[in-house]
Each structure stands twice: as C-alpha cells, then as structure tokens.
C-alpha cells in the first residue's frame, strides 16, 4: 500500500499496480484533495482507495492549526464529521467505508485526554453512514481505539521521533502502517509516495 499527495494519473495508477501496490491513500479534503477521476483511475487499475481526512488550505478558518491539540475539540469533531460525510458522498464513496481522521503531530497523553478523545467521540456520534478510522502515532491510535471511537488505525510509523511511537506496541486494530517515504518511476509515471503495509 501507499499514500501520496501527488495527483494520480493513468500512468501513475498503472505503474503503482505494476510494483505491487493494492491500496492508495489520498486526502479527501484540503490542498491535496483527491478527485472523482483519480479515484476511478485507482479502481480501474485494480487497486482500492483509502480516504484520509485532514483540513488544509481553504478548509481552514481563522488561525486553525491541525497539528496542535487545540484544534481537536468536540465541536470541531462534529463539524469535521459532517464535512467528511458530505465530501465522501460527493466522491461516491460507498457507505461503511472507513475514513481515517488525521492526528498528524506528536500528541502527548494529556492532550489525548483533554482534546483528542473528545474530538473522536464527536466523530463517532456525528459521522453517519461511514466508519471512523484514525491516522496518527501508535499511542494516539491505541488510546482512541481502546475508547471505542475508531474502528481501525492507520499508523504514522514513519515519524520515528514521535514519543507516541517510541516503545509503544502497534495498535491491535491496525489496518495500515506507514513506514517509509520514497520516489518511484520516471517520466509520466514518476510519483512520490509514503510506503505503507
């Protein structure tokens, strides 16, 4: 598997499949939002699409910082659940698809307690027709999943310096484990990806 911010073209989709990629993760919102045509190319190449939610660019209002614990509130979880569901429907994602909500920073236990659990509690209430997944460091994935707020985990193991990854077992509900950034291909098929297993 892999995830990327590069646009998926026909050449890139065929190349990824040829090197053994079966799942492609892409953001559904923000700067690098996937398009319906990209999803079609992924599926037509015989791969599966993995939706990741994280606000960026025009998705943000005011001084929001999605890499800070203060972003993760109950109200923000409610808003993000509604936005993610609406976007998933527009993209034609089937019901019961798992959407991975990103906690893309080294969150400490006190931040998980004060903010992140409340955010995911709201997601679990307000995200209708889709499943809540979590993308983040091992500790955050484990804590949120053990609280019953995420069905599966997409582990940010590439961030080896995160305290939430050091000496922490991979969550028992892990579906994806991101571990290495690289570039593949050449010409029209060249693409930068994060390797995932």
Where do the language-model regions lie?
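Hydrophobic faces of well-ordered beta-strands that scaffold small-molecule active sites
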Residues: 1-4, 23-26, 47-52, 97-99, ...
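Generic structural signal for well-ordered alpha-helices
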Residues: 13, 39, 81-85, 117-124
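N-terminal module-boundary/linker segments of secreted carbohydrate-active enzymes
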Residues: 1-23
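Active-site cleft segment of glycoside hydrolase catalytic domains centered on the general acid/base Glu
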Residues: 107-130
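Aromatic-lined carbohydrate-recognition surfaces of secreted/lumenal glycan-active proteins
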Residues: 128-143, 151
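Functionally critical loop-and-helix segments that line ligand-binding/catalytic clefts
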Residues: 1-4, 13, 141, 146-197
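Extracytoplasmic/secreted cell-surface and envelope-processing proteins
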Residues: 32-35, 59-63, 108-114, 142-145, ...
